[in-house]
Amino acid sequence: ISIIYKFITGSIPPKKELKDLPFRLQKINQNTINDSKSTNFHSLKFAICEASKIFKDFALILLGNPKKEGFKEIEISNPALVVICGKHKDEIFRCVKHENKVLCENLSLAIKEIKKANIKNILFSPGYPSGDDYINFEERGKAFSKLIERNFGT
């Protein structure tokens, strides 16, 4: 692309710095990844793969409305624990195949459940649109980051 740019303009293209997207695999502390932007199975699968490279053992938090994904059954194998929370938790629970999954009413209780299970690493990659729990992924991501800071620090 830079050769084409130079040919057309006669100059070298300016360097562009890529910025991390907020809430897209955002590491908020040594043990926590906030991937609130994950609103579908493909982004969830990618996040699990990336978290598996960073953490030996981790908990995954799922949250949102599975309707957009067609209530598709998904098999999740890597996390030690899958915590499903929010207003659509029962629907998500039926969609997810995992040997160790639990239900929680909300994000705050999900974090407490992970602490109780003594799992140090957390991947928050909801896998679904926000649904009735949050306005959008940004509000959801901010809420998660605040809860992590309150419970673990940064």
Predicted regions and their residues:
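Short glycine-rich anion-binding loops that position phosphate/pyrophosphate groups of nucleotides
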Residues: 39, 65-67, 88, 123-132
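Nucleotide phosphate-binding/pyrophosphate-handling subdomain across enzymes
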Residues: 1-80
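Short, glycine/charged-enriched secondary-structure capping and boundary segments
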Residues: 47-49, 73-76, 96-98, 136-140
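Residue-level preference for the first positions of well-ordered beta-strands
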Residues: 57-59, 119-123
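Glycine/aspartate-rich loop-and-adjacent alpha/beta segment that forms the canonical ThDP
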Residues: 126-154
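C-terminal helical cap/extension that packs against the catalytic core
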Residues: 66-121
